Amino acid sequence: MRAYRVAYDGQPYHGFQRQPDVDTVEGRLRSALVRLGVCERGEGLPDRYAAAGRTDAGVSARTQTVAFDAPAWLSPAAFNGELPNDVRVWASADVPEDFHATHDAAERTYTYYLYAPADADRPEHEPVDDGRWADAVDALAGTHDFHNLTTDETGTERTVAIDWTRDGQFLVVQLTAGGFCRQLVRRLVSLAAAVADGSAPLSKVDRILSPEPVSGPDGVPPAPPEPLVLTDVRYPNVSFTRDEDAAVDARTVFARRRATARTTARVADHITDGL
């Protein structure tokens, strides 16, 4: 039984979990395992397979974790040989036979890179007040019933820790919990951002956290998925070993993507600033 750390760019995919007729990260992992002879053709997955989480369409990951009965020779580098460049396995760990990648995760951390300029000369975005942002985050952190911030109908009481820092025109937001309801991270960010830019009063946080259902125009839409990354999944007593060749390969792949994205942003800056 072995667990693998997987990094991926989620933007081209319809989420992590396999779905019929659409491209998903898990579907790519399974196809690679079929070609490697680890998984039989058909619809099944390897014995005792489980994943740490189900990221939404457009959401990326640095430490998605999958575990299953794997042959000794299946190193991260061997796995990568059958995967697309935007899905990279970079570490692994031998785990007990009863290990479950979903249920045994003690904590999951997501990082959201919120574009939030504080200056008022950005016509494409309302200026963000860091003080209002902090007030909203303080009110949302802790243990609450988040039923108004998820599409889930049960299991909506969670304890969420929220840390954040300003990095230039971005607020880098880290949210940690034992587990998250569906869309909870993105809706938490969306609500705090609405308070921070003045489009919603701070009192809306209390209303959203109240027992009364809030939906429709008064509800909270999810923030866009593309700035969200699954950045850590912690398992007690599991120590992952980085495959240096696979890690170098993954860094190279994502460095190229970073360069492309920065070039695209620079071109957009040039056009925007010249109009």
UniProtKB/Swiss-Prot annotation:
Record-linked SUPFAM superfamilies: Pseudouridine synthase (SSF55120)
GO molecular function ontology, one term from the record: tRNA pseudouridine(38-40) synthase activity
Superkingdom: Archaea
UniProt record similarity statement: Belongs to the tRNA pseudouridine synthase TruA family.
Protein name: tRNA pseudouridine synthase A
Database matches in InterPro entries: PsdUridine_synth_cat_dom_sf, PsdUridine_synth_TruA, PsdUridine_synth_TruA_a/b_dom, PsdUridine_synth_TruA_C, TruA/RsuA/RluB/E/F_N
Sequence positions that bind substrate: Y110
Role summary: Formation of pseudouridine at positions 38, 39 and 40 in the anticodon stem and loop of transfer RNAs.
Keyword tags: Isomerase, tRNA processing
Gene (name only): truA
Pfam families: PseudoU_synth_1
Catalytic activity, as annotated: uridine(38/39/40) in tRNA = pseudouridine(38/39/40) in tRNA
GO BP field: tRNA pseudouridine synthesis
